[in-house]
Regions:
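Short hydrophobic alpha-helices and adjacent helix-cap/hinge residues
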Residues: 1-322
Length: 322
């Protein structure tokens, strides 16, 4: 495995001495954390909070709640956290963010992976969010086009593919449309395959197989990300060349990914949590965007699929798993 240095999110100045504030305020902070299930790439968020002086068991209580792939549970989770009067709510998927915002207009909500937050109505604009939601946005148009371009570079003869996406997440509609549009511009027809819950994956896999696509592109959100093992196993069984967003997929056997790095995204979210705990209003905290992206390739998977990747292509990759 080799990795090239790359720059994470551009950071902005925060209030001075956050550790001193967190440790000397005398307050026990209570923060909600909402996801489908635990993932290791969330750890930098909590490590970042510790670095900033918020230590679980001392001055921080984290109320972790997991929906286990069932988005309909987010409403009850949000209501519970509001009743607990938490100081902030961290959400990792748009349906959870919308559920939380529907339950409270005062508790700060931090969304580290917001897809089209303006289009979904979570915020008014990236520069001036308004309301009680802020976080980090996911770029779609540019990166969606780049993923299709990379797949066509590896497989120049492709004409048909499938996009797997979670339609229960309203933010993903834009991600699918932009991916579909990018494919059309490159002469690749991309068909839609929706899932809305974990129980729908097997039927989705069967439907994809029946289409006999040249490639698969997966729209990443909390559901697809947290069920990536099942998706990767499907692509390996069927020798289906696939493109993902984060290197986590490639490290676990996926062919290729292009996107920003999740650990840095969640570490940066800790700084935003610190800001709101210190009194900053989410309405006044600009939603940040990634500035640098990485290409990851699993060479073992490529070989198992009979793909010969050129030295020039591999030289451009930030991460190559031999």
């Amino acid at each position: 495995m080799r990795r090239r240095e790359f720059i994470a999110f551009a950071t902005s100045a925060i209030f001075a001495s956050p550790r001193v504030f967190a440790q000397q305020s005398g307050k026990i902070w209570r923060v909600g954390f909402v996801a489908h299930r635990y993932e290791k790439f969330y750890d930098p968020l909590f490590a970042g909070l510790r670095e900033l002086g918020y230590v679980e068991g001392q001055n921080l209580v984290v109320e972790r709640r997991y929906a286990e792939g069932h988005a309909e549970h987010f409403k009850d989770i949000a209501q519970e956290l509001v009743k607990l009067n938490v100081d902030a709510i961290i959400v990792v998927t748009t349906p959870a963010a919308m559920a939380a915002r529907n339950e409270t207009k005062t508790i700060p909500i931090i969304h580290p992976a917001a897809i089209d937050p303006v289009g979904t109505g979570l915020i008014a604009s990236l520069a001036h969010p308004g309301g009680n939601v802020t976080g980090l946005a996911v770029l779609n148009a540019e990166t969606s086009a780049k993923r299709v371009e990379l797949m066509r570079e590896v497989l120049p003869g492709i004409s048909k593919g499938v996009v797997l996406w979670n339609s229960a997440n309203p933010a993903n509609s834009l991600a699918f449309r932009e991916t579909e549009s990018a494919g059309l511009k490159l002469g690749v027809k991309l068909l839609s395959q929706e899932v809305r819950s974990p129980k729908e994956f097997e039927a989705a896999f069967a439907a994809i197989s029946s289409q006999h696509p040249d490639i698969l592109i997966v729209v990443q959100d909390a559901l697809t990300l947290e069920y990536r093992k099942e998706i990767i196993d499907f692509t390996l069984r069927n020798k289906l060349p696939s493109m993902f967003v984060g290197k986590e997929w490639v490290e676990e056997g996926g062919l290729m990914s292009y996107g920003d790095r999740l650990p840095e995204r969640y570490r940066r979210a800790a700084d935003l949590v610190d800001k709101v705990l210190r009194g900053a209003k989410p309405a006044d905290i600009p939603v940040e965007q990634p500035t640098t992206f990485e290409l990851a390739v699993n060479l073992r998977t490529a070989r198992s699929m009979g793909l010969a990747l050129s030295p020039a292509f591999l030289a451009r990759a930030d991460l190559v798993i031999e």
